[in-house]
Structures are given as C-alpha cells and as structure tokens.
UniProtKB/Swiss-Prot annotation:
Pathway involvement of the protein, from the record: Lipid metabolism; fatty acid biosynthesis
Tagged with keyword Lipid metabolism: yes
Stated name of the protein: Long-chain-fatty-acid--AMP ligase FadD26
Highest taxon of the lineage: Bacteria
Disrupted-gene phenotype: Deletion of the gene produces selective loss of phthiocerol dimycocerosates (PDIMs).
Natural source organism: Mycobacterium marinum (strain ATCC BAA-535 / M)
C-alpha cells in the first residue's frame, strides 16, 4: 500500500489482523513494584480498546476536531492517543500537570488548540479538570476518564473516518509558554519519517529485525518518545517496552537492565541520560547481563557531547556494548522527528575544526598535529535532495565548508504550525535561490539550526537565535557549555546579555555547594570560577563577563529538557537567580 494511502489507524488495523495475539506494548510500573509491575496489551487488544475510545469520542465532536491527551505515562495514554486518531480527530499529546502546580504551558496549548475533549485517567482527573474551561466563547472540553470506559467490551465497528486535512496530531514545540506553536503532523509525515529512520539506522525496512524490542522511558507527549514508543511499533510491528521518565530518573540503571534483558533492543535518549546511566549504574546492577544484543541507542533531542559518548561506551564495554551502538542523530518536530544520522554500523566520528575559522563562519579541520580546536560530531552524509546548508539572508546554497542554516525537504516535513499561517509560510515554504542541479527549489523547511557540510558530512553548531556575538565574532553557546561541563558536570547555560555597546558572555552554572564549612565552600566556588574563566579563554579566546553559580534546578528548561536561554537572560537581568557565589 502506498505511503499516501496509509494512516495510523490503518496501520493499527493491519497489526491487529496480522499479529493479533503478539505483544504490542508492555508498560513497567515501578511505583507498584520496585522490580517493575508489567502490564501488557496485544495488538488486537490495543485495536479493540482504541475503537472503544473512538466510539466514545464521536459523541463529542466530528473528524478534524482536536482531542487533548493529558494522562500519565502508560497503556492508557497509548490507547487514548490511538483512539483519538481512530475517530478521525486530531490528537494533542500533552504532559499531565504535576503536583497541583498550575501549568501555564498546558493552559496555553489548550487555548491554542481548543479541543472538544480531554482524555485522561481517574488517577489524575482532579488536576486535569481544572484546565477544562471555556476558551474564546467555545464550550469547555469534555473530560473523559479512559480507564473507566468498558475497554474490553467491543463496540459496533465503524468505518474509519479521516480528517479532510490528513492531520494526525499537533506536536507542540518546547519553547515560550506564552506563544506555543503546534506543529501539524500528518499521517503521511509519520509513516514517511519512520520509514526514513529505518533506512538511516538499519539500511532499510527489510533489514529491520522482526524480533526487535523498542525500549523507551521518553515521555509520550514529546516527539521522540511518541515516534519511538508508539508510532515505530505501529509501522514495524515490533514490541515496545515502556517505563515512565520518573522511573528512569529515580534509578537510571533500570534503562540499562531493560536493554540487556530484551532481545535486539533499540532505544533513544537525550545526552543527559547517557551521563546519568554512566554515573548511577553499578556493576552489580548489570551482574550476569549482556548488552551485546543492543541494536542501537539514538542520542538526540539536545546537544550531543563527544565526551559523554566516550564515557558511555567505555563504561558499558565490559558488558559487551558495541562501540557502534550509540547513534548520534539530528531531528526536530517540524520534520516529524528524524532528519539525519551516520551510516548504520559506524562508530560515532568526530572532527576538530579551527575555532577562529568557525567564528568567522568557515569549517576548517585542524591539522593532525594536536592543534586545539572545536570537536564536532558527524551526523553522517544526508541525502543532498533532503538536506542543504543555505545562507539564511540570501537563500542561496552555501558551498562545502561554509556555515549556514540547515534546510530540510521531503514527505516527512510537517504541514505547518496550527493557526499560524504567516509563521508557517516563513518556516515551511522556503525557496532556494538558483538551486544547483538535483536540488529541489522548494518547499524547504527552515530549521533555525546552524550547520555545515565538510567532506560530505553534516556537522551542527546550534540554534541561530542562540548565537553569542561578541566584538563581531560568532560564538556557539553549545561549544562553550561543553567546555564548562567538562569541569562542572552539571547543567550550564551560556547566554548573551546585551550592554550599551555589544553583547557580553554570561555563564549560568548549576553546582552543588560542597565544603565542611561555609568558608571552605566559598574557597571551592572561587576555584571553580577561576578554572571556568581560564578554560573559556583558552579554548574560545573569549572573556566571560560573569560566571553565575546557582543550585541544581535553577536554570529554566523546556518540557523536553532544553535550556530556555531567553528566560535565562530575562532572569539574569532582573537578578532572579539565587547565586551561590554572591560573596565571592
């Protein structure tokens, strides 16, 4: 069946017909049992329950209406999401409000998407109902507790309705809570992107082992968690073993144990998770276990630190983890998820580039004589018709070695932003001026990320809007943060704070206060500040205007763990950080 004729509901029906009694999803609940209480659904059960939810939803709206999912990580979340799509509605995956604190992001998304219903569970309905209010004169969304529906009693089968637009769900990007942007992801986008990733990670769908197990603790409302944990199993028919993000954070060794105890595992995580796994997994945790069967672990969603990959592979090498297991990957919600990754079976590769040249916008590899430079990780050689480096001002392709904006093209590129036509046109409908032979003129997705092609390989610098421009030179905050993290190990935000003449570099650094006394702690803080200032000067030829040491948890982040640099600047300028070094 051609990709354009398929949908997520049709894929679910296919899996239920072809492998009705095979396990589709297993959720391990570590709150019920420290060893993980397993709840499992077969493909036929998932389909039947999704149909029940779909039938229920038909009483509240029509295909094309939005339905928000605000439920805890678990099987009910999966059934709710698939049920919404089964009814032809547009899903809006969201996180559950936590601990009774008002979640402005949830409120903003509900205002923007105006769902006719909210799917939740009885465990959190009290918190969720507070958000089910009337918006802009529209009726308040109905709140449906999925676990209280009679999910195991089949309802009359109905023809699968589809929204006229082909929209599957709105993936709200992690950015400002005041102006959320919902990426409109179609059924075609999802299927095309999963298929594209199968080529990127395995060499093609036909080379994807049928007995693969997806292992994921990533939140299902996040693009990487949604595609890996729900959509990839739908496309491939593989089994997914899931746990909650909190279960991972409380005990990172659980992730490694699951990777070692299931056949042919494939997983994904942001950079910080690899660090946690290294620091908080003991040899005893993996006693008698073997990681030699792990097919791959995608590293994505945030800046990938070369040192982290090295530490991770070295730490778990005694348990037979392949040096090629970690798969550095580049992607974004506007492209559904996946954009580029190195060739299957290759170990992560890095190249050192001359820092001075990079600040001038040119990638010049350092000589092989130990020259100090900026070490960047390769994201492989993407299809030239799908990825281009473009001058964001002139819209002309950049030659190899020249830094520019990464543009993406293909069936995986999403449809636009929900109810934001002008922003959608600027971002999703770009045109290359005088394209080279073989390069599509458009439409191209402007990613907002800076990258460069060098010797046919893609390297990434960071977000255009996050550039630190000092004395007319471009500095990449990700590089500066990597330098600092090698010293401190915690979360770091390198930000540009404007003064009357230029921008000044300020480093916000999370650090645990250590010392037998207040005086000893201050001595250690002074030492850390001196070491950081020296390292940045040496590695980046850059003076730090201020080094701000703060307690862990102080730096504003998005729901996916990315640093909110604009919020950091605002908080810094208003003296909003609780500084550990105020007397230093």
């Amino acid at each position: 069946m051609p990709v354009t004729d398929r949908s997520i509901p049709s894929l679910l029906k296919e899996q239920a017909d072809q492998r009705p009694n095979e396990t589709a999803f297993t959720f391990l609940d570590y709150d019920l049992d420290p060893n993980g209480f397993a709840e499992t659904l077969t493909w036929s059960q998932v389909y039947a329950r999704a149909c029940v939810v779909a039938d229920e939803l038909t009483m509240y709206g029509v295909p094309g209406d939005r339905v928000a999912i605000l439920a805890p990580q678990g099987l009910e979340y999966i059934v709710a999401f698939l049920g919404a799509l089964q009814a032809g509605f547009i899903g809006v995956p969201l996180s559950t409000p936590q601990y009774g604190v008002h979640d402005e992001r949830v409120s903003a998304v509900l205002r923007d998407s105006q769902p006719v219903a909210i799917l939740t569970t009885s465990a959190v309905v009290g918190d969720v109902t507070k958000y089910a209010s009337s918006q802009d004169g529209q009726p308040a969304p109905s709140v449906i507790e999925v676990d209280l529906l009679d999910l195991d009693t089949p309802r009359p089968q109905q023809a699968l309705p589809q929204p006229a637009s082909g929209s599957a769900y709105l993936q709200y990007t992690s950015g400002s809570t005041r102006t959320p942007a919902g990426v409109i992801v179609s059924h075609e986008n999802v299927i095309a992107n999963v298929t594209q990733s199968l080529y990127g990670y395995f060499g093609g769908p036909d080379k994807f082992p049928a007995d693969t197990t997806v292992v994921s603790w990533l939140p299902l409302f996040h693009d990487m968690g949604l595609i890996l944990g729900i959509c990839a199993p739908l496309v491939t028919g593989c089994t997914a073993v899931l746990l909650s993000p909190m279960s991972f954070l409380r005990r990172p060794a659980r992730w490694m144990q699951l990777l070692a105890s299931h056949p042919k595992c494939f997983s994904a995580a942001p950079n910080f998770a690899f660090e946690l796994a290294v620091r908080r997994t003991t040899d005893e945790d993996l006693a008698g276990l073997d990681l030699g069967d792990v097919l791959g672990i995608v590293s994505g969603s945030e800046r990938i630190h070369v040192a982290t990959i090295k530490r991770f592979t070295e730490r778990f090498a005694p348990f037979n983890l392949s040096p090629a297991a970690v798969r550095p990957s580049y992607g974004l919600a506007e492209a559904t998820l996946y954009v580029a990754a190195p060739e299957p079976g290759t170990t992560p590769r890095t190249v050192r580039f001359d820092y001075e040249s990079l600040t001038a916008g040119h990638a010049r590899p350092c000589r092989a004589d130990g020259s100090v430079g900026t070490e960047l990780i390769s994201y492989g050689s993407p299809d030239p018709s799908a990825v281009r480096i473009v001058n964001p001002e002139t819209m002309i392709e950049n030659p190899s070695g020249t830094v520019g904006e990464i543009w993406a093209h293909g069936e995986h590129v999403a449809m636009g932003y929900w109810q934001k036509p002008e922003q959608s046109d600027r971002t999703f409908n770009a045109r290359i001026v005088n394209p080279a032979p073989g390069t599509p003129e458009g439409p191209w997705l402007r990613t907002g990320d800076l990258g460069v092609m060098s010797n046919g390989e893609l390297f990434i610098m960071g977000r255009i809007k996050d550039l630190v421009i000092v004395d007319g030179r471009n500095h990449y905050p990700d590089d500066i943060e990597a330098t600092i993290q090698e010293i401190t190990g915690g979360r770091v935000a390198a930000i540009a704070v404007p003064d009357n003449i230029t921008e000044q570099l300020v480093a916000i650094i999370e650090l645990k206060r250590r010392g037998a006394s207040a005086e000893e702690a201050m001595v250690k803080l002074r030492s850390v500040k001196r070491e950081i200032t020296s390292a940045i000067s040496k590695s980046h030829s850059l003076r730090v205007a201020d080094v701000v040491l703060v307690p862990p948890g102080s730096i504003p982040i998005t729901t996916s763990g990315k640093i909110r640099r604009a919020a950091c600047v605002e908080r810094y300028r208003s003296d909003g950080f609780n500084r550990l070094d105020v007397t230093v």
